[in-house]
Amino acid sequence: MLNILKAFLINLWLIGIIFAAESCPSISPKMVEDTPSIQVKAIFDDIVCSFIDLHSKSDGTLSSTLNLTKKKIIPYIDLEYSTQLALSSYWDQLDARERKVFERDLKSSLIEDYISILASINNWENINVSVSDEYFENENTARVKLTLSLKNSNESASVVLKLVRRDMWKLYDLEYQSISIMSIEEIGYDSKIKRQGIDRVVDNLLKKP
């Protein structure tokens, strides 16, 4: 059940990324106003324009999509902050090397969950995404609402993107109907660590290619 929920949430995140752009070429997030909602729009525009360019060259293969994902999506996610949330109280028990091991595992998990979906998308015209100008900001974190809808349909869904700011605003989670990707990751890691112990989990992650 958790895997189904996680896949559903990541699909929503993915759809938001893929269909948010209105025009290409995009403007770099570094060149626009430093507010959460404008940064979200600029981030998504940059990503989607890159995928449009990829598909215009008829190069939407799994390999090319994977490379573009690593280059254009992952850099906009604050993996360290996401991993800290996913590990909750376990985070403070880890040294710097062990934290990087879990960060790498989370990155791999996110890529594996949506890369095949990214590679299979061919129809770019039927989904609209609206980024709300209003946002909630608290110190160095923010929440921005996205509304997704189908063309020629009254159906829509709203999701909340969560961002954290260090040197720039980056995504760290997505929430839909009070369920978030990182809360599901937290449940998964907590269950695994309680069964195996944190040292064994780290050892197993180190053995992964």
Feature-to-residue mapping (PLM):
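Classical Sec-dependent N-terminal signal peptides that target proteins to the secretory pathway
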Residues: 2-22
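Alpha-helical propensity feature that highlights long, continuous alpha-helices across diverse contexts
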Residues: 21-30, 50-54, 124-125, 129-139
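Early exported N-terminus immediately downstream of N-terminal targeting peptides
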Residues: 24-118
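Solvent-exposed loop/turn segments at secondary-structure junctions
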Residues: 91, 108-109, 150, 178-181
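Surface-exposed aromatic
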Residues: 99, 144, 171
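Surface-exposed, charged secondary-structure patches
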Residues: 104, 112-158, 208-209
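Short beta-strand edge/turn micro-motifs at domain boundaries
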Residues: 156-184
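Low-complexity, intrinsically disordered terminal/linker segments enriched in charged
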Residues: 173-209
